Amino acid sequence: MSVKDKLEIYLRLARMDRPIGTLLLMWPCLMALVLAAGGMPDLKVLVIFIIGVVVMRACGCIINDYADRKLDSHVERTKSRPLASGEVSVKEALTLFVVMGLIAFGLVLMLNPLVVQLSFVGIILTIIYPFTKRFTNMPQMFLGVVWSWSIPMAYAAQTGTVPAEAWWLFAANWCWTVAYDTMYAMVDRDDDLKVGIKSTAILFGKYDRQVIALFQLAALACFIIAGWAADRGLVYALGIITFVGFSLYQQKLIYGRERAPCFKAFLNNNWAGLSLFVALGVDYLV
């Protein structure tokens, strides 16, 4: 196998060919930096966090595939993943995970001690998450914590503290993550039931759409409070309204609980997050 072919496999293992996860991680992280800075964040901090999100998302994907390597081959959507298909060895995957983790830690060391301390919690959460699908019906709720951890880190990097407003944004992103990752889990629900993987899509059962709606409403409320705490104005409010519109569209997509529309609803959350981030940024400009 050529070096080019091997590199392509490593990139797929790190999910570099599917940026949706990186984008969903990026928008709340950037929102946190903007809110913490009261506008334009420090350029060094901004660059470190953008690179860090990409690297840590790759770490999360690699350790997730390691944990699920024996199950992914039985799930239609995941059977072609490099570890499940045997394109890379466990040793190669774990080596890549360590390398990416060291890169992420090197980035963190350029920031203040509080960020470094928070980063240890972040990597532990990242490693634990894939295994929660074995012993809890609520792995999406744990993922919400993992995917929101960049928010207190962003505030710490920008201000040296983690104020109350940061935790409102954390709560908003946690609720939003549970909502969209449950949509994602609805895609795999039938396969997950066969192989014994647990998820909120299975836990919520016939009430899945209603519970997702509740989490969307809770996320909306927390985003509003976070904006109010930061004294945001009309443009941010328009972003909130746009976020509501995307949420309603997602509810329409998941109504029939079919795989393709549910996956489309999950992907649509990228635009919901982008619209809210852009609205926040423009709100500071005007």
Swiss-Prot record:
Catalyzes the prenylation of para-hydroxybenzoate (PHB) with an all-trans polyprenyl group. Mediates the second step in the final reaction sequence of ubiquinone-8 (UQ-8) biosynthesis, which is the condensation of the polyisoprenoid side chain with PHB, generating the first membrane-bound Q intermediate 3-octaprenyl-4-hydroxybenzoate. Keywords: Cell inner membrane, Cell membrane, Magnesium, Membrane, Transferase, Transmembrane, Transmembrane helix, Ubiquinone biosynthesis. The chain crosses the membrane at residues 20-40, 43-63, 96-116, 142-162, 167-187, 210-230, 234-254. GO terms for cellular component: plasma membrane. Belongs to the UbiA prenyltransferase family. The keyword Transmembrane applies. It holds the Pfam family UbiA. It is found in: Cell inner membrane. GO terms for molecular function: 4-hydroxybenzoate polyprenyltransferase activity. It comes from Shewanella woodyi (strain ATCC 51908 / MS32). Its EC number is 2.5.1.39. This is 4-hydroxybenzoate octaprenyltransferase. The gene is ubiA. It is a multi-pass membrane protein. One of its GO terms (biological process) is ubiquinone biosynthetic process. PANTHER family: 4-HYDROXYBENZOATE POLYPRENYLTRANSFERASE, MITOCHONDRIAL, PRENYLTRANSFERASES. It catalyses: all-trans-octaprenyl diphosphate + 4-hydroxybenzoate = 4-hydroxy-3-(all-trans-octaprenyl)benzoate + diphosphate. Its cofactor is Mg(2+). Its main location: membrane. It is an enzyme of class 2 (transferase). Pathway: Cofactor biosynthesis; ubiquinone biosynthesis. The keyword Transmembrane applies.
